[in-house]
Amino acid sequence: MSKKLWGGRFEKGTDKVVEDFHSSIRFDQRLYKQDIRGSIAHARMLGRQGIIAASEAEQIIEGLEKIMADIEAGRVEFDVAAEDIHMNIEKILTERIGDVGKKLHTGRSRNDQVALDVRLYLRDEITETGRLLRELITVLLERAEEHVDTIMPGYTHLQKAQPITLAHHLLAYVQMFGRDCSRLVDCAKRFNISPLGSGALAGTTFPLDRMAVAQELGFDGITENSLDGVSDRDFAIEFCGAASLIMMHLSRFCEEIILWSSQEFSFIELDDAYSTGSSMMPQKKNPDVAELIRGKTGRVYGDLMALLTVMKSLPLAYNKDMQEDKENLFDAVDTVKGCLAVFTPMIRTMRVRGERMKAGAKGGFTNATDVADYLAKKGVSFREAHEIVGKMVLMCVQKSVALEDLSFEDFRACSEAFEEDVFDAIRVERCVADRKVPGGPAPDAVKAAIQAARERLS
């Protein structure tokens, strides 16, 4: 006779190879807190509804609380033969309190049980991931305040484009990570409904109080269709999508950190604590943390694609394929949290070479647009001004000089609209200061943006 909790229908036990292949306890044991919390709420409801005796419910709850304490103290060894965290806990409970433990699963299936556990787990992890994102945003705002006047080149196509400030650049990432926070909040709102009571797929004949269990566990409501409650993992996929966007933003920032810390740019220097050396070349100081985050981005993309692929062809309701959701979800959670935890202090401690940034902003004709704008303000159409300045840039390239190095006679030869004030108008400091439009790099606009971001964060 099989000793499986589901073994009554079978004449012989599972092959050992199948047992090992089938078991998920190796990775789903991290759900023990959520599983026990859900079971306690379920047992309490069973007792309150008179489905089991109140004394039996209390005995089950007390047993589950002791199991929780023993797991946290490292006194529990899980059994591969019991398959998963749900069956392991029920097996331990029954061994400790006897046949009363067998009543815990009344009106419940592992299908709705695991759907509940994963929701509880993801809700906890979204809270922590959001905290890490807000910590990063706080650091970015602090660094932005330090560098409101630190001029640097802005780029398009990785070619110098227009002068901006480091604060303005950092605030772009504040916006991106702020949207990442919003996505996590939205994701949690959508899945914060309890599937418990959906049973295997068609609910149950027992008079369960689904709403009471949902409220005890902090859910906003219950799933409205038992098939949907157990058969979809769109909430896990949505999280992995949000996680992929977080990683994409981190990866873009890391790419810039890697470039900026190179000798060719030399805009920043990373703290020794967030750099590594070479086993052969003694002079090397490598931005390995940034490179590794950039590399791990593809890993999280892979987690998203794996979940989408698992779910793409599954008929309703539950299928064993869905056991494959957890490792990818857990990996995405761990990777994002790990990257945020190391990225934030790296940004907090990096040293900015402001003079080097400003020198970079003075090269590459970053003030060319301002020359065209100057002409437009003098009454020249912008398209004509664009043509004039393009020819001026070509002349400068041929002479190996900057626009501001041209003589006033050179300017007048290109257009009689130029006056002596052109030299002040095209200084990089003036180019930045004049961009006062909301969202622009002018110091006052940046300070307003920092204040607005702080208010959103509070």
From Swiss-Prot:
Compartments in which it is found: Cytoplasm
UniProt entry tagged with the keyword Repeat: no
Pathway: Amino-acid biosynthesis; L-arginine biosynthesis; L-arginine from L-ornithine and carbamoyl phosphate: step 3/3
GO cellular component: cytosol
Record's catalysed reaction(s): 2-(N(omega)-L-arginino)succinate = fumarate + L-arginine
This enzyme's EC code(s): 4.3.2.1
MF GO annotations: argininosuccinate lyase activity
InterPro entries: Arg_succ_lyase_C (IPR029419), Argininosuccinate_lyase (IPR009049), Fumarase/histidase_N (IPR024083), Fumarate_lyase_CS (IPR020557), Fumarate_lyase_fam (IPR000362), Fumarate_lyase_N (IPR022761), L-Aspartase-like (IPR008948)
Biological process annotations from GO: arginine biosynthetic process via ornithine; L-arginine biosynthetic process
EC class: lyase
Source superkingdom: Bacteria
Keywords for this protein: Amino-acid biosynthesis, Arginine biosynthesis, Cytoplasm, Lyase
NCBIfam families given in the database record: argH
Entry similarity comment: Belongs to the lyase 1 family. Argininosuccinate lyase subfamily.
Protein's name in the database: Argininosuccinate lyase
Organism listed in the record: Heliobacterium mobile
